[in-house]
Curated annotation (Swiss-Prot):
Keywords: Cytoplasm, Fatty acid biosynthesis, Fatty acid metabolism, Lipid biosynthesis, Lipid metabolism, Magnesium, Metal-binding, Transferase. Its EC number is 2.7.8.7. This is Holo-[acyl-carrier-protein] synthase. Mg(2+) binds at D8, E60. The lineage of its organism: Bacteria, Pseudomonadati, Myxococcota, Myxococcia, Myxococcales.
């Protein structure tokens, strides 16, 4: 049963502008929004801004799918590499909200084209009673 659905779109140029900013501001943004694993993955790529944009979109989409729970942090949602497809790992407020909803599986898809990155998140499970 689908318990939640979220979608988000991010302009890659917006992330490029942030990454081109003062180093202290860039570091603050990256540490607030992305886990160490996400930063390592994105920073190793030539298309760094695109990878960050797609992951940012996934975090926003997950928050929407969960009903935008109060206190959720960007780092509560982590995009990790799965076997051929990205996987979302939830922690903190996101994990608590998912458990409360009865979520058993989180599906995510990422895409980018024409300067835009997008993500869709589907929460699957049995409705909590």
């Amino acid at each position: 049963m689908i318990l939640g659905l979220g979608m988000d779109v991010v302009e890659v140029a917006r992330i490029e502008r942030i990454l081109a900013g003062p180093p202290a501001r860039v570091d603050r943004f990256l540490e607030r929004c992305f886990t160490a694993r996400e930063r390592a993955y994105c920073d190793a790529a030539r298309d760094r801004a695109t990878r960050y944009a797609a992951r940012f979109a996934a975090k926003e989409a997950a928050s929407k799918a969960l009903g935008a729970p109060a206190g959720i942090r960007f780092t509560d949602v982590e995009v990790v590499r799965g076997a051929g497809a990205p996987v979302l790992e939830l922690a903190g407020v996101a994990a608590t909200a998912a458990a409360r909803l009865g979520v058993r599986r989180v599906l995510v898809t990422l895409t980018h084209d024409g300067g835009v990155a997008a993500a869709t998140v589907v929460l699957d499970g049995e409705e909590a009673r």
